[in-house]
Amino acid sequence: MAKYEILYIIRPNIEEEAKNALVARFDSILTDNGATVVESKDWEKRRLAYEIQDFREGLYHVVNVEANDATALNEFDRLSKINGDILRHMIVKLDA
């Protein structure tokens, strides 16, 4: 299984319950499509290097995933692009 790290930035003015629901939803998208979530944790609220959608800071969330193929990652990528609460995301394949 290949190991991946997903980092996404959530808009800072989201309510705590909505943020938890968003994180749970995207974790379940990964597991429903065949990936294993090793770790999913909030990083911190950080200042952005430049404004994104009129926000100067964002809530960073890191997910470590193991997957046999890219199905789960492609679905995560597709849905995070159309979700208004996620400002940016990045998927990186980790060296074994």
Curated annotation (Swiss-Prot):
CDD domains: bS6
Gene3D superfamilies membership: 3.30.70.60
Superkingdom as given in the UniProt entry: Bacteria
Xref: InterPro entries: Ribosomal_bS6, Ribosomal_bS6_sf, Ribosomal_S6_plastid/chlpt, Transl_elong_EF1B/ribsomal_bS6
A cellular component term, taken from the record's GO annotations: cytoplasm
UniProt-recorded Gene Ontology molecular function terms: small ribosomal subunit rRNA binding; structural constituent of ribosome
Keywords: Ribonucleoprotein, Ribosomal protein, RNA-binding, rRNA-binding
GO annotation, biological process: translation
Pfam families hit by this protein: Ribosomal_S6
Keyword Ribosomal protein carried by entry: yes
Purpose of the protein: Binds together with bS18 to 16S ribosomal RNA.
NCBIfam families on file: S6
PANTHER family: MITOCHONDRIAL 28S RIBOSOMAL PROTEIN S6 (PTHR21011), SMALL RIBOSOMAL SUBUNIT PROTEIN BS6M (PTHR21011:SF1)
Family, similarity comment: Belongs to the bacterial ribosomal protein bS6 family.
Protein name: Small ribosomal subunit protein bS6
Species of the source: Streptococcus thermophilus (strain ATCC BAA-250 / LMG 18311)
Lineage: Bacteria, Bacillati, Bacillota, Bacilli, Lactobacillales
Gene name, Swiss-Prot/TrEMBL: rpsF
